[in-house]
């Protein structure tokens, strides 16, 4: 949504039909830190995997973060479908443990699609942009996410490996750039 101010973006999102929240990953992780326990984040790719993760989390009485890559979102016909499926399964399965729905390594556009769909956490991977562009997009997304009570991660530099066809060579990130991104208030 390039070129639009934050207030216009928020108005468009809220006019979209509202956002039904699950739980913010930040809220969940803050409680885990205070309680000295870990929270698992599992990327989901289909209904069966999602059901298995939710039922296991419920059985173990453990909060859980359900991660969705852009590729998995496309495979499951879109982020609105994923969010609707998770919310319906949460209700139909009687899940009572906290559940966060997280976009994992999302594009700028993917982050907005997930916000509109009702995700409670986004990870913007702007590491492939020049730093100033990454900073501008990260700043905008942090402001929008926090105004909506969502948690947000932003990436600078890269981690070695491949996901959804994106290859990170594992270069070390510039510590000053990391601090600048962290100072935005990322969660």
What are these regions (language model features)?
Residues 39-43, 101-102, 123:
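Short catalytic-loop micro-motif centered on adjacent basic/acidic residues
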Residues 19, 40-41, 125, 169:
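Short N-terminal micro-motifs specific to bacterial/archaeal maturation
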């Amino acid at each position: 949504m390039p070129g639009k101010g934050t207030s216009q973006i928020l108005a468009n999102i809220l006019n979209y039909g509202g956002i039904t929240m699950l739980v913010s990953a930040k809220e969940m992780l803050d409680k885990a830190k205070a309680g000295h326990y870990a929270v698992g984040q599992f990327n989901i790719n289909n209904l069966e995997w999602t059901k298995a993760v939710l039922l296991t989390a419920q059985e173990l009485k453990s909060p859980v973060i359900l991660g969705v890559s852009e590729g998995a979102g496309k495979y499951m016909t879109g982020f609105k479908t994923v969010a609707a499926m998770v919310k319906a399964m949460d209700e139909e399965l009687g899940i009572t443990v906290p559940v966060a729905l997280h976009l994992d390594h999302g594009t700028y556009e993917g982050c907005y699609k997930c916000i509109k769909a009702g995700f409670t956490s986004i990870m913007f991977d702007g590491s492939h942009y020049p730093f100033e562009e990454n900073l501008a997009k990260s700043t905008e997304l942090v402001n929008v996410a926090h105004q909506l009570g969502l948690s947000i991660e932003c990436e600078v530099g890269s981690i070695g490996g491949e996901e959804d066809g994106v290859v990170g060579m594992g270069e070390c990130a510039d510590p000053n750039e990391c601090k600048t991104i962290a100072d935005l208030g990322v969660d």
